[in-house]
């Protein structure tokens, strides 16, 4: 499976085309809209989320609530486009009109794609860069992830995400929660945190950053349960599932780090305390005493829960802008200011769920049959029986 997205932040719409989704998957707009709404929530979100209503239109690949096996096209309209029709129009405009309506940007923002992208593509107007590099594009990545979550659900895999840290405020580790319990708790938290004792402190940190014109980042975690043993591969570097998951996390806007299981903590512990001892019983088959590997060894699933974390840096658009240089005059200026969030970590957690869900669904479809859901389900059932008796 693969997908490609298109569209600009203030353009008419965002589009994603999904290829390789098996036939026979139950899919309706409500499944996708639920995830889009989750992305819009979270303490620290900016005014843009008050403008957009983010609902999906399914325009191909689905008939009467069932996928056909052909490419699926999903569209999300940008409600804010009505205020940008001249600025973001596709048709040519005169030089006079250009000066009046283009809202040209020549002062790149540190931390964004602005300067590097302008140099790469030769854009003298940085708006041509920021419109596409904006995290608004993650709207349709979440839509794609919603489809992946439907695949996982029908294949017996559950997934949830939560926030571990915001602006230096850390949540306590809470273990032994089911995926459903994590989902319920986080959906009722304005910062998607499992630890209610630090929830207000996280919100205060966000509010303080906003009032000072600053921004803060954080850490999110995604957990998936129900993956069969042996999904992925040790044979080739580009088929290792942990590599794909780390790459997916790093592809999210403003994410600067990824870890699986205990992650970087493994460097501080001896091997005897890091590696997960193997157990077997007649009821469960092969299991592990611990899950420090985060459900992945040698590029393949172990059958234990997948645990992936991502680090999000503070959003680079600041209301007290940093020093920059005008690319036209080369004079020192403060960077341009665009409408932005003070903290998008809770929303980014939803995006992280989506990209992890896509990689897991892709791996299952690739390994157990590509064409139809019924066949994939049968193959996974047979594989699980085989692995248990191995």
Curated annotation (Swiss-Prot):
Signal peptide: none
SUPFAM superfamilies in the cross-refs: Chorismate synthase, AroC
InterPro entries: Chorismate_synth, Chorismate_synth_AroC_sf, Chorismate_synthase_CS
Keywords carried by this UniProt record: Amino-acid biosynthesis, Aromatic amino acid biosynthesis, FAD, Flavoprotein, FMN, Lyase, NADP
Presence of the UniProt keyword Flavoprotein in the record: yes
Presence of keyword Chaperone: no
Binding site for NADP(+): 39, 45
Domain of life: Bacteria
Pathway: Metabolic intermediate biosynthesis; chorismate biosynthesis; chorismate from D-erythrose 4-phosphate and phosphoenolpyruvate: step 7/7
Known cofactor(s): FMNH2
Species of provenance: Bacillus thuringiensis subsp. konkukian (strain 97-27)
Protein name listed in UniProt: Chorismate synthase 2
An example Gene Ontology molecular-function term: FMN binding
Annotated family: Belongs to the chorismate synthase family.
Record-level GO cellular component terms: cytosol
Positions bound to FMN: 132-134, 253-254, 298, 313-317, 339
GO biological process, alphabetically ordered: amino acid biosynthetic process; aromatic amino acid family biosynthetic process; chorismate biosynthetic process
UniProt enzyme class: lyase
Biological function: This reaction introduces a second double bond into the aromatic ring system.
Cofactor note: Reduced FMN (FMNH(2)).
Record-listed E.C. numbers: 4.2.3.5
Catalyses which reaction(s): 5-O-(1-carboxyvinyl)-3-phosphoshikimate = chorismate + phosphate
Assembly and binders: Homotetramer.
């Amino acid at each position: 499976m693969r997908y490609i997205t298109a569209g600009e932040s203030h353009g008419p719409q965002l589009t994603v085309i999904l290829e390789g989704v098996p036939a026979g998957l139950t899919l309706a707009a409500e499944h996708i809209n639920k995830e889009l709404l989750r992305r819009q929530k979270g303490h620290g979100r900016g005014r843009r989320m008050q403008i957009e209503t983010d609902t999906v239109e399914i325009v191909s690949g689905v008939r009467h609530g069932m996928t056909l096996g052909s490419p699926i096209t999903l569209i999300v309209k940008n409600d804010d486009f009505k205020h940008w029709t001249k600025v973001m129009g596709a048709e040519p405009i005169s030089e006079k009109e250009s000066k009046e309506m283009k809202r040209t940007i020549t002062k790149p923002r540190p931390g964004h794609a602005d300067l590097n992208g302008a140099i790469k593509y030769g854009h003298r107007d940085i708006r041509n860069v920021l419109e596409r590099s904006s995290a608004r594009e993650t709207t349709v990545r979440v839509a794609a992830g919603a489809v992946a979550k439907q695949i996982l659900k029908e294949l017996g895999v559950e997934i949830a995400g939560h926030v571990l840290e915001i602006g230096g405020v850390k949540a306590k580790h809470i273990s032994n929660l089911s995926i459903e319990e994590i989902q319920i708790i986080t959906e009722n938290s304005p910062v998607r945190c499992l630890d209610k004792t630090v929830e207000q402190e996280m919100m205060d940190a966000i509010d303080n950053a906003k009032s000072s014109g600053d921004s803060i980042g954080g850490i999110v975690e995604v957990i998936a349960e129900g993956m069969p043993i042996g999904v992925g591969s040790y044979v080739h570097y580009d088929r290792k599932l942990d590599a794909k998951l780390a790459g997916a996390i790093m592809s999210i806007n403003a994410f600067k780090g990824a870890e699986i299981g205990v992650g970087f903590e493994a460097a501080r512990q001896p091997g005897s305390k890091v590696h997960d001892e193997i157990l077997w019983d007649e009821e469960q088959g092969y299991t592990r005493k611990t899950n420090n590997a985060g459900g992945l060894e040698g590029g393949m699933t172990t059958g234990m829960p997948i645990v992936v974390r991502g680090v999000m840096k503070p959003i680079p658009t600041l209301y007290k802008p940093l020093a920059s240089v005008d690319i036209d005059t080369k004079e020192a200026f403060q960077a341009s200011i665009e409408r932005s969030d003070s903290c998008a970590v809770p929303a980014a957690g939803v995006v992280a769920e989506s990209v992890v869900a896509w990689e897991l669904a892709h791996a299952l479809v690739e390994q157990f049959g590509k064409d139809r859901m019924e066949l994939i389900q049968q193959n996974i059932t047979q594989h699980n029986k085989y692995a248990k008796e191995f």
